[in-house]
Amino acid sequence: MKDAFVIYRYPSAGNKCVIVKQDESSLKKLHSFSELGKADGFVFAPFCITEDTPAVLFDSPIRRVTELDYDNILREVMYNGNCCVLNERLKPYNGKLYDRKSYEEDFNCFKAAIREKRIDKAVLSRSLVLKDDNKKNVIRMFLKACENNSDSYIVLISSDQTGVWLVATPEVLLERCGNVFHTIALAGTMDKRLVISDNESKAIGKISDIDISCWSNKNIWEQQ
């Protein structure tokens, strides 16, 4: 029997995190978000759910709250001595390393496409391969992410079905207050501290009593 787990820290939650641990065989594969129904748990999903890449539901009712401490977290994760995936050695990486030259070539392709008006916007990312065969070190990486990003939602996921993922995001995709749902777009990163006048709000559009007069048209458009 092998355990999978999720560890997450809410924004501004101080020194506390939540651990959800579940037997690997009891994780639920979802091939559509409609399968969630009234399920209660942690959902890890790809951008596009397919037969080969389903969403995975951690629905264990046991959720332990513990302090952000390496020994405490490791003790909770290894609780009952189940064969946790963190006990295993990482497999050697045989893929292609994404070097600086490859990144520059991709960047130039993106830049040319934007200049030629073939696309309006592009996001270029890269991967970084760390040479470390001890999976337990990802817990230290999780703690470091919590320390460096106090206002972000930090998650560490580990299971055979998903692999090992460390996530950090300041973005609230969707929150509910009663029957009201609220979503946030991060496209506008301008200073939002000033309140605009009624005349200005009529001219450029009012968004939650914040000053958007200094925003670019791009940011105003993306925040609609």
Residue ranges and their predicted role:
Residues 37-39, 175-224:
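Cytosolic ligand/metal-binding cores
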Residues 24-130, 178, 215, 219-221:
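Non-catalytic accessory segments adjacent to catalytic cores
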Residues 134-177, 181:
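SIR2/sirtuin-family catalytic core signature
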Residues 47, 126-128, 157-161, 168-170, ...:
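Short, structured patches in soluble enzyme cores that scaffold and shape functional sites
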Residues 8-15, 45-51, 157-161:
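Short, flexible beta-strand-to-coil junctions
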Residues 1-35, 130-133:
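Short Lys/Arg-enriched alpha/beta "domain-start" segment
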Residues 3-11, 120-122, 152-157:
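A short, Trp-centered hydrophobic/proline-enriched beta-strand micro-motif
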Residues 51-55, 66-68, 132-133, 167, ...:
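Short helix/loop capping segments that flank catalytic or ligand/cofactor-binding pockets
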